[in-house]
């Protein structure tokens, strides 16, 4: 289990104006949803969060310290401003240690497929798996090596090896990656308009019917 630390402050100010002031002060407004579903308004330091954000995935457990108490959470959602390229708001969800959870984990393909060197094209299927396990057993990401994949071969969910403590809920026959040849283009060139006219002129006229 990959785990990181992030400090947070509980906040008592709400609304758009308060959020704008907070961001100007270098803080990001956020909400933590605890294990009982209760929402706790918090804010985090922008620089500290962005350093963390570059190192984690959606399945990384973060230790969130707020008001002197530690919470084990996921970064479940965030709002991104495409103009300023900054994070505007974050949603954290608490997980309960020792209790099974269900979540989706990203798949990352690695390696240069054998089939691509033979003229094939790598086609990707699903990009994440739904898993069930204890928080301590949850992988941050799923690495799949496609180096040995040759032309007309596929890799499915059932081919991915995970620890015994992790249960895969995604159907095992779904394709993760495949190597296929590009569709062959027709080698017969289409006749141009001029060629069609010349062909029509050269064709013999039908014999006149007897009256």
UniProtKB/Swiss-Prot annotation:
SUPFAM superfamilies: Ribosomal protein L25-like. One of its GO terms (cellular component) is cytosolic large ribosomal subunit. The keyword Cell membrane does not apply. Gene3D superfamilies: Ribosomal protein L25, beta domain, Ribosomal Protein L25, Chain P. Keywords: Ribonucleoprotein, Ribosomal protein, RNA-binding, rRNA-binding. Residues 199-211 have a biased composition (Low complexity). It holds the Pfam family Ribosomal_TL5_C. Residues 185-211 are annotated as: Disordered. GO terms for biological process: translation. GO terms for molecular function: 5S rRNA binding; structural constituent of ribosome. It comes from the Bacteria. Part of the 50S ribosomal subunit; part of the 5S rRNA/L5/L18/L25 subcomplex. Contacts the 5S rRNA. Binds to the 5S rRNA independently of L5 and L18. This is one of the proteins that binds to the 5S RNA in the ribosome where it forms part of the central protuberance. PANTHER family: RIBOSOMAL PROTEIN L25/GLN-TRNA SYNTHETASE, ANTI-CODON-BINDING DOMAIN-CONTAINING PROTEIN (PTHR33284), RIBOSOMAL PROTEIN L25_GLN-TRNA SYNTHETASE, ANTI-CODON-BINDING DOMAIN-CONTAINING PROTEIN (PTHR33284:SF1). Belongs to the bacterial ribosomal protein bL25 family. CTC subfamily. This is Large ribosomal subunit protein bL25. The gene is rplY.
């Amino acid at each position: 289990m990959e785990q990181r630390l992030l400090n947070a402050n509980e906040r008592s100010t709400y609304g758009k104006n308060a959020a704008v002031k907070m961001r100007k002060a270098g803080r990001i407004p956020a909400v933590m949803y605890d294990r009982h579903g209760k929402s706790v308004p918090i804010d985090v330091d922008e620089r500290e969060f962005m350093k963390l954000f570059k190192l984690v995935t959606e399945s990384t457990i973060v230790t969130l310290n707020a008001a002197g108490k530690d919470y084990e959470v996921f970064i479940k959602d965030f709002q991104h401003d495409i103009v300023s390229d900054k994070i505007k708001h974050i949603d954290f969800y608490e997980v309960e240690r020792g209790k099974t959870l269900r979540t989706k984990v990203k798949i990352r393909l690695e390696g240069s497929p054998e089939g691509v060197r033979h003229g094939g094209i790598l086609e990707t299927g699903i990009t994440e798996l739904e898993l069930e396990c204890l928080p301590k057993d949850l992988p941050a990401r799923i690495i799949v090596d496609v180096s040995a994949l040759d032309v007309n071969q596929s890799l499915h969910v059932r081919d991915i090896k995970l620890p015994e403590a992790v249960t895969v809920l995604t159907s095992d026959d779904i394709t993760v990656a495949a190597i296929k040849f590009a569709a062959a283009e027709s080698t017969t060139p289409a006749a141009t308009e001029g060629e069609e006219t010349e062909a029509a002129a050269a064709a013999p006229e039908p014999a006149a019917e007897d009256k």
